[in-house]
Amino acid sequence: MAAMMNNERSSSNKLQVDAENPAAVGDELDLAARANWLRAAVLGANDGLVSTASLMLGVGAVKAEARAMVISGFAGLLAGACSMAIGEFVSVCSQRDVELAQLERDGKRGGEEEKALPSPAQAAAASAMAFSVGAVVPLLAAGFIVNYRLRIAVVVAVASVALAAFGCVGAVLGRAAVARSSARVVLGGWAAMGITFGLMRLFKASGI
């Protein structure tokens, strides 16, 4: 009972402090918004890394030339960045329309709430940039290695290190277990790369 009373007193004091210091509340909300943006950027970079590395390994399973792998990776970077940007733009536009309609009903159009709404163009640019940052990692890893086996190994190794780093950052931002989150991201990336490489090897072996 005493613990409950202490908790209630603590909550009451916190509310009183927040009410007396609205700037602190605004700072907390701003930090939370920034953390969400950063976490979305990490996820976008992870998508770019996994999809591009898997695409390059899939092409590498059929063709041993470095040029073919690099060109396929660059094409994947461009296509993925455009797809992410367009998808994010459409998604944020839809969200913005809904929130503007709500502000219209509340009679708050033109106020601070409207100015605080997310920008579709900024969201699209950020999404494309994040994807590109992740996608360029395997491209740089494979672009300067002539030996086929070494190139494949380096792409997998560099992608694994980057995946672990992305998983670590995502865990810190989401306040989750770092080791478990990083392992989950790395294992997921390995699964995507392994399945793509293996299926393309079977495709090559079938002679189709």
Curated annotation (Swiss-Prot):
Pfam families: VIT1. GO terms for molecular function: iron ion transmembrane transporter activity; manganese ion transmembrane transporter activity. Residues 1-41, 91-125, 173-184 are cytoplasmic. Keywords: Ion transport, Iron, Iron transport, Membrane, Transmembrane, Transmembrane helix, Transport, Vacuole. It comes from the Eukaryota. Residues 63-69, 147-151, 206-208 are vacuolar. It is a multi-pass membrane protein. One of its GO terms (cellular component) is vacuolar membrane. InterPro entries: Ccc1_fam. It is found in: Vacuole membrane. Disulfide bonds: none annotated. One of its GO terms (biological process) is intracellular manganese ion homeostasis. It catalyses: Fe(2+)(in) = Fe(2+)(out). Its main location: membrane. The chain crosses the membrane at residues 42-62, 70-90, 126-146, 152-172, 185-205. Probable vacuolar iron transporter that may be involved in the regulation of iron distribution throughout the plant. Belongs to the CCC1 family. This is Vacuolar iron transporter homolog 5. It comes from Oryza sativa subsp. japonica (Rice).
